[in-house]
From Swiss-Prot:
It comes from Neisseria gonorrhoeae (strain ATCC 700825 / FA 1090). SUPFAM superfamilies: Ribbon-helix-helix. The gene is fitA. Antitoxin component of a type II toxin-antitoxin (TA) system. Plays a role in the speed with which bacteria traverse human epithelial cells; disruption of the locus increases the speed of trafficking about 2-4-fold. Binds to its own promoter, binding affinity of the FitAB complex is 20-30-fold higher than FitA alone. No nuclease activity was observed for the FitAB complex, perhaps because FitA (the antitoxin) prevents metal binding and thus catalysis by FitB. This is Antitoxin FitA. Homodimer in the absence of FitB; forms a heterodimer with FitB; 4 FitAB heterodimers form a complex that binds to fitAB promoter DNA. The complex is also seen in solution.
Length: 78
């Protein structure tokens, strides 16, 4: 298993994690591990639409032409 050292973590963040861990009956280390695991799992389940939207935002947005027809006069024969 890998080990990670986090330097310069604010006291407020450390206290918040300790409080969250204590409330869940876990150690601070176990709580941090759970938080990181949840983030890693969420990253793996990114959907295509979300990924494309993120790319669009990174490049400043994209204007797409509306290509749907506006004519509603055609009857549909089933």
């Amino acid at each position: 298993m890998a080990s990670v050292v986090i330097r310069n973590l604010s006291e407020a963040t450390h206290n918040a994690i300790k409080f969250r861990a204590r409330a869940a009956g876990r150690s601070t280390e176990a709580e941090i591990r759970l938080i990181l695991d949840n983030i890693a799992k969420a990253q793996q389940t990114v959907r295509l639409g979300s990924m494309l939207a993120s790319i669009g935002q990174e490049i400043g947005g994209v204007e797409l032409e509306d290509v749907r027809g506006r004519n509603t006069d055609n009857e549909v024969s089933l």
